[in-house]
Swiss-Prot record:
GO terms under biological process: glycine decarboxylation via glycine cleavage system
Gene3D superfamilies in the record: Aspartate Aminotransferase, domain 1, Type I PLP-dependent aspartate aminotransferase-like (Major domain)
Species per Swiss-Prot/TrEMBL record: Pseudoalteromonas translucida (strain TAC 125)
Assembly and interaction partners: The glycine cleavage system is composed of four proteins: P, T, L and H.
GO MF annotations in UniProt: glycine binding; glycine dehydrogenase (decarboxylating) activity; pyridoxal phosphate binding
Required cofactor names: pyridoxal 5'-phosphate
Name of this protein: Glycine dehydrogenase (decarboxylating)
One Gene Ontology term, aspect cellular component: cytosol
Domain of life where this protein originates: Bacteria
Length: 963
């Protein structure tokens, strides 16, 4: 057999590469022929400037099979020790209902969707997020809630920012934090305050009123477990015209009076213990609520109820003009990616258990705390407080002995305070656990009976929650929280919502700058392993050796891929990565006596988070012009760099550019900035066009953030989670984020944290680790090359029908292109919005609309899409062009055509009335391929103006279900 395959070929060691990369060799050949090149290498040579091509290949190892990868990672995970965690401090063990685990967390219909900017094809997760907001409003007792923030600590930092914006104490520049707030929250808020130039005052809660402040933060219950009435504290803060913020435990709010009812202006916290694993720190969804009067200052996305074209209720993201991509340096926050997938899990947890089920869980946790307290006090153990919900703090001279017994028993307590330790109970606590806790604290032979103590408490009651703070109002009364308590009903509810949403498991999502590539199943499997999901972020490091190995390997690979010298994995979104990178630059300048360097140059084409992040780092922004080809105007750059040379801090630049081209002058740009004493911050949003071909460090950049949820395959989750690690050159490494509880090696001791957990959203890092492992050095390079091939083929075909706005050398684009719809709009009146909505009828999510240029679509196919799917998208765009031509010719009027009526629902096309200039079948099935896999939007076009003018951000009242 002369043509027999080699053993190496039969072993299929590189099989994952062909699974990840969409086009087959034959399809690649066809695309190259269309581009009139003979090889991928020839196309790359025409596209990527020779001067920035890597001289050496990546060294992240050879590709491994899926089986090998998971087997090795399982052996690494086994080095983690999963102790019973009673550490608390914002992180608690929880039971993830299996119906949610399997059908949401492990379901690509939920985890591969994008942020719901196209609401007509996102009504499912929008409803779930509205449930999350309704849950937040009910439990906090406030008027308005957002659809999740990154974690409790960053939510507290956002609360400080809101307080400064809305407080009438305009001369005050100090923010007060009670000393019984979680340590990590004090850390993160202090980091944010340092950049804003705010003073942080940490002290006894009662002292807040003694300071000139614009806001204050209290913990409810306190980090050591005390439950106190904070009504007077809140009133005292408000008497200073300051804003009273409360970080609350979400489970406790089933039993405790809502902070809003106590007078709080802002209530925030983590929804983690509502069915989301601890995951060594994340990801978790934070909740955030405030008064209606402050709605324009609310950070994060807000889901609101509006009307569609037919007058039906429909959901959308409300008040989007507040967001960073529009407001830029004037935005309330730089937050972009939030925690939608985790918010949905928490919302489904509340839906599944309902108000009575949640209250029962909270009562059980509290009862066990009462039992534990009664037993310990009966034996003379001194408790720090007389009130509690779930956490007891023991004051002890024998702390070391108790902790030693705990560790020997596979148990963790909170030990980060001198002379005391805390025991935080959770949903997972059992009678046997309480008996074990007696043994650990008291030693053997104590003679206590859990059952006997429980009976005594049942007979005599408990005073550990003051009567004045007992919750007496009903919560979660909406039907969504009272209808789906059997698994059958819950399963169908989840499926019903999933069916309303278009995700990657249905079709290509070609959002430019978003890199919606394959999130392989093998990459996702490890995140639910208990060895990764059940660790507390503050557990002793010797219990997290598996994590340290995995994160260490990922760190080294990212260093190699980026050409930097060190990486921080702490930032839990790209925006947080930008913020952390800019802080590193500021601290570097300060260390050299150059604290005055505070000017950030930003090209006019920059992503909206860039100016928003720069203003968060208190930098002065100077905008650099772009030329007619979309490149940085070098003359303008040089002039402005020279003009601000004494105060130049950095430039923020994206590469390839946000316009989708490899700018030839990128190294010259870096040189200009360095010559004037500045640093180069390269936005990693387009790293998918660099890996293995070039790198930020090789080009000359000093720091970048990476979007692991773009280039490195963490799914977008419908709007989060994300991970935004930063890579830096050696001179910036000491200035990366540290942490107040778990020291991060290689960083200066005084560096603050930017995320609540030392390693951010650690439990999803195995996704990127697995992607790199299975692709290997060669596979990663092939992925970049194929992203470039797909983008150029798509551009070539679309250019026959639409103008392409920007191109680079040899008329090539990088990994995305911008289709200019403005000429067609002038001729026809058809807008980019009309095109985006009509694409839904063809089964596609719209590309990025009106960014970075108004009136355009930015399209990024990624390497994971086959030529078949790309051709299907091209067919849709060409068909839409023919529809626009009919409007231009007068065959269809601007008022009566399928574009302005798009999208079309089943109810629309099957309705009794039809007065359109086109037939019903064409409305829904404009090309034959649509019929093979038809996706039906569930609402017609949504009225954005109505939604903002009539803001409703909670589930509609029961009456609407009767209509």
């Amino acid at each position: 057999m002369s043509n027999a395959k080699s053993l190496e070929q039969l072993e299929q060691t590189q099989d994952f590469i062909r699974r990840h990369i969409g086009p087959s060799p034959a399809q690649v050949s066809d695309m190259l022929s269309a581009l009139e090149v003979s090889s991928v290498e020839e196309l790359i040579g025409q596209t990527v400037p020779a001067g920035i091509r890597l001289e050496q290949p990546l060294t992240v190892g050879e590709s491994r099979t899926e089986v090998e990868t998971l087997s090795y990672l399982k052996s690494v995970a086994s080095k983690n020790k999963v102790f019973k965690s009673y550490i608390g401090q914002g992180y608690h063990p929880t039971h993830v209902p299996h119906v949610i685990l399997r059908n949401v967390l492990e379901n690509p219909g939920w985890y591969t969707a994008y942020t719901p900017y196209q609401p007509e094809i996102a009504q499912g997760r929008l409803e779930s997020l509205l449930n999350f907001q309704t849950m937040t409003l009910d439990l906090t007792g406030l008027d308005l809630a957002s659809a999740s923030l990154l974690d409790e600590s960053t939510a507290a930092a956002e609360a400080m920012g809101l307080a400064k914006r809305v407080s009438k104490a305009k001369k005050a520049n100090a923010f007060f934090i009670a000393d019984d707030v979680h340590t990590q929250t004090i850390d993160v808020v202090s980091t944010r305050a340092e950049q804003f130039g705010f003073e942080i005052i940490v002290g006894k809660a009662a002292d807040a009123v003694n300071h000139e402040i614009f806001g204050a933060l209290f913990q409810y219950p306190s980090t050591t477990g005390e439950v106190v009435d904070i009504t007077d504290l809140i009133a005292g803060v408000q008497s200073k015209k300051a804003i009273a913020c409360v970080a609350a435990d979400i489970m406790s709010l089933l039993l405790l009076k809502a902070p809003g009812k106590l007078g709080a202006d802002v209530v925030l916290g983590s929804a983690q213990r509502f069915g989301v694993p601890m995951g060594y720190g994340g990801p978790h969804a934070a909740f955030f609520a405030t008064r209606d009067a402050y709605k324009r200052s609310l950070p994060g996305r807000i889901i609101g109820v509006s009307k569609d074209r037919l007058g039906n209720d429909a959901l959308r993201m409300a008040m989007q003009t507040r967001e960073q991509h529009i407001r830029r340096d004037k935005a309330n926050s730089n937050i972009c990616t939030a925690q939608v997938l985790l918010a949905n899990m928490a919302a489904f947890y509340a839906v599944y258990h309902g108000p009575q089920g949640l209250k029962t869980i909270a009562q059980r946790i509290h009862r066990f705390a009462d039992i534990l307290a009664a037993g310990l006090q009966a034996k003379g153990v001194s408790l720090k407080h007389n009130t509690w919900f779930d956490t007891l703090t023991v004051v002890s001279d024998s702390k070391a002995d108790v902790i030693a017994r705990a560790l020997a028993s596979g148990v963790n307590f909170a030990t980060n305070r001198d002379g005391e330790y805390s025991i935080a109970l959770s949903e997972t606590t059992t009678r046997a656990d309480v008996a074990q806790l007696f043994d650990i604290v008291l030693g053997e032979g104590h003679g206590l009976s859990v059952d006997a103590i429980a009976a005594d408490i049942e007979n005599n009651g408990s005073t550990s929650i003051p009567a004045s703070l007992e919750r007496d109002d009903e919560v979660l009364t909406h039907p969504n929280f009272n209808s789906y308590h059997s698994e059958t009903e819950m399963l169908r509810y989840i499926k019903r919502l999933e069916n309303k949403d278009l995700a990657l498991n249905h079709s290509m999502i070609s959002l430019g700058s978003c890199t919606m590539k394959l999130n392989a199943t093998a990459e996702m499997i490890p995140i639910t392993w208990p060895e990764f999901s059940n660790l507390h972020p503050f557990c002793p490091l010797d219990q997290a050796q598996g994590y340290q190995i995995m994160m260490g390997e990922l760190h080294d690979w990212l260093v190699n891929i980026t050409g930097y010298d060190a990486v921080s994995l702490q930032p839990n979104s790209g925006a947080q990565g930008e913020y952390a990178g800019l802080i590193a630059i500021r601290k570097y300048h300060e260390s050299r006596g150059d604290a005055h360097r505070n000017v950030c140059l930003i090209p006019s084409s920059a992503h909206g988070t860039n100016p928003a992040s720069a203003q968060m780092a208190s930098m002065k922004i100077v905008v650099v012009d772009c030329d007619k080809n979309g490149n940085v105007d070098m003359a303008d750059l040089k002039a402005k760099a020279e003009a601000v040379a004494e105060n130049l801090s950095c430039i923020m630049i994206t590469y390839p550019s946000t316009h989708g081209v490899y700018e030839e002058t990128i190294r010259e740009i870096c040189d200009v900035i360095h010559q004037h004493g500045g640093q180069v911050y390269m936005d990693g949003a387009n790293m998918n066009a660099q890996v293995g071909v070039t790198s930020p460090g090789f080009i000359g950049s000093d720091v970048s953030h990476l979007n692991l949820h773009k280039t490195f395959c963490i799914p977008h989750g419908g709007g989060g989670p994300g991970v935004g690690p930063i890579g830096v050159k050696s001179h910036l490494a000491p200035f990366m984020p540290n942490h107040s509880i778990i020291n991060v090696p290689g960083t200066n001791e005084g560096n603050g944290a930017v995320s609540a957990a030392p390693y951010g959203s650690a439990s999803i890092l195995p996704i990127s680790w697995a992607y790199i492992t299975m692709m290997g050095s060669e596979g990663l390079k092939q992925a970049t090359e194929m992203a470039i091939v797909n983008a150029n083929y798509l551009t070539h075909e679309l250019s026959k029908h639409f103008p392409i706005l920007y191109r680079g050398r040899n008329n090539r684009v990088a990994h995305e292109c911008i289709v200019d719809l403005r000429p067609l709009k002038e001729l026809s009146g058809i807008t980019e919005m009309d095109v985006a909505k009509r694409l839904q009828d063809y089964g596609f999510h719209s590309p990025t609309m009106s960014f970075p240029v108004a009136g355009t679509l930015m399209i990024e196919p990624t390497e994971s899409e086959s030529k078949v799917e790309i051709d299907r998208f091209i067919e849709a765009m060409v068909s839409i062009k023919s529809e626009i031509d009919k409007v231009i010719s007068g065959e269809w009027s601007i008022e009566n055509n399928p574009l302005v009526f798009a999208p079309h629902t089943q109810g629309d096309v099957l309705g009794n009335e039809w007065d359109r200039a086109y037939d019903r079948f064409y409305a829904a099935f404009p090309v034959p391929s649509v019929a093979k896999n038809k996706f039906w939007p569930t609402v017609t076009r949504i009225d954005d103006v109505y939604g903002d003018r009539n803001l409703v951000c909670a589930c509609p009242p029961v009456e609407t279900y009767r209509d």
